[in-house]
Amino acid sequence: MTIQTFKSTDFDVFTVDGLEERMSAIKTNIHPKLEALGEQFAEYLSKQTDENFFYHVAKHARRKVNPPNDTWVAFSTNKRGYKMLPHFQIGLWGTHAFIYFGLIYECPQKVETAHAFLEHLNDLKTNIPNDFVWSIDHTKPSVKLHKTLETEDLQKMIERLATVKKAELLVGIHISPEEFSAMTNEQFLAKIESTMQSLLPLYALCNR
C-alpha cells in the first residue's frame, strides 16, 4: 500500500484561524496521514527493537481556546500513552516537519536516561549526524543544530534533563516545506526510516 504523506501545502493548516476551524482542518487533512504513518512505523520500530510499539495521534483534547501550532503521531511501547516513556515522534509545525526521539517532562526515566547519555557523551557527539537538531521544549519550534554544539553544550542539556523537573530533551531532524516540494513519498518514508535508525541507539541507552 502506498502511503500518501505530507504535501508542502499541509503546512498551511496552521494558518487557519479559530480552534474549531483549525482542528477540523487538522482532522481532515493531517490526521489520516499521521494514522497511516503510525501504522507503518509502529510496525517498523517493533521489528527493529523486538518490542511492541503502539502509535498515538495527538488529539489536542485539552485545548479550549487557542488552536494548536503543531500536531504529531508518537510511538511508544505503552498502548495507553507515550508521554511517560522515551518515544519517537513524526509531526508538523507551520514551519517544518519533524522526526524526533526524546523524553518530555512527564517521563519518570529522565534521570536514569541522562546518566546513560552522559556515560556515552562522546559517542553521542560523534555519532549523531551533523544535520540533526536538539530541542529542550517540545512546545516550541526552536532548536539547536547538532554540528554547532560543543561537547560541553551537549553535556549541559543532558545534565539539565536530570536536574530540572520540567526539562525535556528531543533529537532528530526538521524538513522545511521547500524540501518537501522536492521530495517524493518514497523519499520521505526513507528519510523517516533512516532517521529512526540513527536514533535507535539512544532508545537502546534508555532501556539498557
From Swiss-Prot:
It comes from the Bacteria. Transmembrane segments: none annotated. InterPro entries: UPF0637, UPF0637_domain_sf. HAMAP family: UPF0637. Belongs to the UPF0637 family. This is UPF0637 protein BC_3960.
